[in-house]
């Protein structure tokens, strides 16, 4: 099963989501991985209420998939990737990250996570202020 995600409708409209899905499909074809499901999601990796992510979780829990292919860890979730991986493994589901070449230290991962959080909350804050000014 392929899971592709972008953060915004703008990224989806510019074709980023389709290109990501295509790269994942090509990877699966090259490695002879059968793909029964492709889930495309739009939303923040911090949001656990994403429709596609919840569909994926239901497929995992009901035993309908045995592999989940993602481009980067942060496409699945911004935080707690290893926790999600452990849960999926409990259901005999492997997560394959096709672009996992940037192994980083725990300190570097924490720094990236904090920067992601700041960017997310800053975007929400400034978006809210902008909306209030337009009213």
Question: What residue spans do the PLM features occupy?
Answer:
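Short, structured surface patches at the beginning of a domain
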Residues: 1-135
């Amino acid at each position: 099963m392929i899971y592709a995600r972008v953060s915004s409708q703008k990224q989806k409209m510019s074709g980023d989501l389709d290109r990501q899905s295509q790269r994942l499909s090509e990877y699966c074809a090259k490695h002879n991985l059968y793909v029964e499901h492709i889930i495309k999601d739009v939303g923040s990796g911090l949001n656990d209420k994403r429709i596609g992510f919840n569909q994926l979780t239901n497929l995992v829990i009901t035993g309908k998939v045995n592999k989940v292919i993602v481009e980067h860890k942060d496409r699945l979730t911004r935080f707690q990737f290893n926790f999600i991986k452990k849960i999926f493994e409990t259901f005999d589901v492997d997560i394959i990250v096709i672009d996992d070449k940037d192994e980083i230290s725990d300190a570097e991962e924490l720094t990236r996570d904090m920067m992601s959080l700041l960017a997310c909350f800053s975007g929400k804050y400034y978006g809210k202020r902008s909306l209030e000014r337009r009213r």
